[in-house]
Every structure is written in structure tokens, then in C-alpha cells.
């Protein structure tokens, strides 16, 4: 062990995170001129929580080796495994920022489209307005899961490609980005004055749902296998935070768009604000997928499935 008072860098990092989180909440309460007006309590509180978790995680990682000899090695290794999984979770938050907007941004886009009642295969008795397209997601999930398990994954294995959990999750993030590119192309057509059928939205829904199956279901299995028995409940709790922080990315982006300088820049691109944001979120997903792939190549897999 280090001498008393030495090697406490992790404590300083964690303390800095706590102080910064408190400072952010105080800044929101006082409302100085330099604090963004669009950062209300929800955004500020989520940012403060993110800073607290990030700095706490880094600080804990730096201090873990000091705990050996005081705490059992298994306990120390369990905490380190949780910290590694949290990085994986953090890299999936951009996916949720895209996925959750299907119930808002995509519905708004769909309301500008024409409902194709004239198509013989269109279920007019089920889909009478854009919001009802949401029912396509759970229906596709029930089809895609058995397709992946019975057809896609065995086919990949026969080709010598093992669809590991991390590979599936990274691919799922990419598919979410592709879905938003398709949605952006549809938005360009709408902005150009074309009459676009709501049926075209089936493609981004299909791509996004395929990504959801690869990310969401796989991540739960992955986290369960990586966490030790004592930490499985903890890791599940952190998983539910990924959706929260995914929504935070959307809040921050929308707050940034309301800035005059950003609005002026969007105008120079020739795109509408909606189209610009769709392509922005697609790029955000691709950047996250690259970061995910880089980390996944270095991730030391564990096997902590329950045997009884």
C-alpha cells in the first residue's frame, strides 16, 4: 500500500466531480448572466449527475489498487468489472438519443406525410394517423429476434464471423444512424414540397428496430454476464440510466439549436432545422459507434453467468 496521504489522486478527482456538480446546481439556482438560459433544472440536474458519475468512476478506478490487502481481491475485481461495463453503457447513450425520438420527431415528420389508404396492403383500420406507426416497433421486435437467432446469427457463424455481444451492440448503433439518414432524406423530400407517403417511414422504423434488438436485448445479456453475483443488481440500475442520458443529449442539442449563431450556421447549409438535426444525430451515432468499436477491441470479456 502507498504511504499515508500519498496516491490519493482518485479521491481528488471524485471530490472535484462532486464540487463541480454542486457548482452547476448553484449556478442554475442563482442564474448568472453566463449560465445558458435554456439550461433548466432538468438539464442541469442531469449534467450534474453525469459529472458526478464520470468523476466518481474515474476516481474509484484510480483508487482501486489501494484497496487490495484491505478488501478481498474478488470485491476489488467486481468493482473494476462494473466500471468497465459503465464505459460500454456510456457509449450506448447516443443510440437512445436516436431511438427515443421515434415517438416525437418521427411522429411530427409523419404528420406532414400522406396516409396511403389507397394501397391495398396498407392497414387503414390500424394506422389512421402518424402516431400509430409506433405500433410497428413492437411488432418488428417480435419478428426480428427469432430471425436473428434462427437465421442471421447461424449464417454469420458459418461464414466465420462470431456475432459477439459487443459486435452486435456496435452494429446496432450503426443501424440507428442509418435509420436517421433515411429519415433525413424523407425530410428533404418534404422540405422540397413533395408529397411523401407515410409508408416510406416503414424503412427507418425497420432499421431502428433492428438496431434496438442488437443493442438493448444484447446489452442486458452482456451486463449480466460481466457483473459478478454481488453486482448484478447495481449494473442493472446503471443500465436504466442510459436512456435518461440519451434523452439528455437531445435536450442539450435542442438547447444549442436555439442559439442564434447555430441557427445562422444551419441556414447556410441550405437544410431545414429538422433535416439538419436528423443528419446531425446520424453522425452522432456513427461517431459513437467508432468509439464503441475502439473500446470493444480492448475490452477483457468475463464470464459471470449464474451456474445455479
Residue ranges of model-derived segments:
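Membrane-embedded alpha-helical bundles of multi-pass transporters/translocases
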Residues: 84-99, 105-109, 136-156, 160-218, ...
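Intracellular loop-helix junctions on the cytosolic face of multi-pass helical membrane proteins
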Residues: 1-132, 147-148, 152-161, 165, ...
Amino acid at each position: 500500500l502507498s504511504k499515508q496521504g500519498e496516491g490519493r489522486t482518485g479521491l481528488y478527482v471524485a471530490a472535484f466531480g462532486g464540487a463541480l456538480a454542486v457548482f452547476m446546481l448553484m449556478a442554475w439556482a442563482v442564474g448568472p448572466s453566463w449560465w445558458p438560459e435554456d439550461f433548466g433544472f432538468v438539464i442541469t440536474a442531469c449534467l450534474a449527475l453525469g459529472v458526478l458519475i464520470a468523476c466518481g468512476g474515474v476516481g474509484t478506478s484510480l483508487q482501486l489498487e489501494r484497496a487490495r490487502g484491505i478488501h478481498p481481491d474478488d470485491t476489488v475485481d467486481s468493482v473494476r468489472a462494473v466500471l468497465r461495463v459503465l464505459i460500454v453503457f456510456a457509449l450506448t447513450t447516443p443510440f437512445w438519443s436516436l431511438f427515443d425520438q421515434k415517438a416525437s420527431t418521427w411522429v411530427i415528420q409523419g404528420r406532414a406525410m400522406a396516409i396511403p389508404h389507397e394501397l391495398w396492403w396498407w392497414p387503414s383500420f390500424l394506422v389512421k394517423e402518424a402516431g400509430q406507426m409506433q405500433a410497428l416497433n413492437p411488432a418488428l421486435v417480435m419478428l426480428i429476434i427469432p430471425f436473428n437467432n434462427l437465421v442471421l446469427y447461424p449464417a454469420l457463424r458459418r461464414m466465420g464471423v462470431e456475432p459477439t455481444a459487443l459486435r452486435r451492440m456496435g452494429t446496432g448503433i450503426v443501424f440507428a444512424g442509418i435509420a436517421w439518414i433515411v429519415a433525413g432524406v424523407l425530410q428533404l423530400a418534404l422540405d422540397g414540397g413533395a408529397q411523401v407517403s407515410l409508408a416510406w417511414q416503414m424503412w427507418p422504423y425497420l432499421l431502428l428496430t433492428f438496431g434496438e434488438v442488437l443493442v438493448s436485448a444484447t446489452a442486458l445479456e452482456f451486463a449480466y454476464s460481466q457483473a459478478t453475483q454481488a453486482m448484478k443488481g447495481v449494473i442493472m440500475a446503471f443500465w436504466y440510466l442510459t436512456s435518461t442520458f440519451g434523452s439528455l443529449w437531445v435536450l442539450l442539442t435542442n438547447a444549442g439549436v436555439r442559439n442564434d449563431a447555430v441557427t445562422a450556421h444551419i441556414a447556410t447549409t441550405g437544410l431545414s432545422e429538422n433535416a439538419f438535426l436528423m443528419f446531425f444525430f446520424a453522425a452522432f451515432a456513427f461517431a459513437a459507434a467508432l468509439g464503441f468499436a475502439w473500446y470493444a477491441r480492448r475490452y477483457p470479456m468475463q464470464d459471470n453467468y449464474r451456474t445455479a
